[in-house]
Amino acid sequence: MAIEGDWSNTYRVNRYVRGLGTDRSAEQALSGYREFPRWTWRNAEFRDFVERLRVWNLAQPPERRVGVYGMDVYDIFNAADSVLAYLKRVDPAAAARARRQYRCFSTYERKAEEYGAAARRSVYSCREEAAAVIAEVARIPRPSDPRQAEEHFAAVRSAASVAGGEEYFRTVFAGSLSWNVRDQHMARNVEGIAEHVGALSGQPGKVVVWGHNTHSGDARATFAANRGELNLGQLMRQRHGDAAFLVGFFSYRGRVVAAPAWGLAHRVYDMRPALPGSYADVFRSSGVPAFSLILRGNQELVRQLGEPRLERAIGVVYLPHSERLGHYSQARISDQFDAAIFIEKTEAVTPLG
């Protein structure tokens, strides 16, 4: 499983669900999520899922246990720490070289935004240093022992997270398409996870991706394409064809945990009823409060849902008083997703800590 969370904190959850590490409960394993927007994964509902997954996993042989990995880009400094800790155990000389490379980030006090702003003002960045550490880790052969192979994989993806985070924050402050950088990083993580899982099990790897519709749908069927944006769902379809199955989630009304702006405290909002004529409104008009639709291969559904309609997207920020402008855009759901899940009324998650 790949979730829209950072690599390092999610890897702690992965160790817990696999019966590894020192955490004694799912809530403790989730306690690493301290930064905004921590409630997205540090909540009671995800905690309960993690506990159930651990119980299931412990009844399986190690190679069949389901992992939970982070695919997002907001992880430079914790990921660098993980790389250095791994190299120190397996190759102290490589660890020393990597530490020298990562000193490039040391003046920014573990604040990625400060690095991005500084890189914008200078012709110098830490791009080459981050790439050099990726090469250091890549030189270490992948162990045959499943547990050691898992640790090696974690180091590989941690090094990639440093490089991905460096590129993302440098791009954000340069005014370029940072969205594309982020979703391309997600795609590399998902493909890396699939390859790793396949190597462990001896079968083609399967990854369930858990993220917002804006990442998991196909951007070519949305207004985002007009802005030159791509996304994870699009990349998976382009690279893997029908092996990628994209599922969207829709709700008409309910409550949601969000913040009024990035970095501010979260609160529970009443989610406004969906706008007339939007996809969620059309789904509600069926009179069925919860259902799923398989769009792929269903020509009648594709015909009925093929015209562009408004589609709502609520992420970690919610602005109900300017909802039409900030949370709706045109989309063609029949091209965006292979399936859609609709629940008329949804409830907010329960934040922990």
Regions found by a protein language model. Give the residues of each.
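Structured catalytic-domain cores with a bias toward divalent-metal coordination
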Residues: 1-353
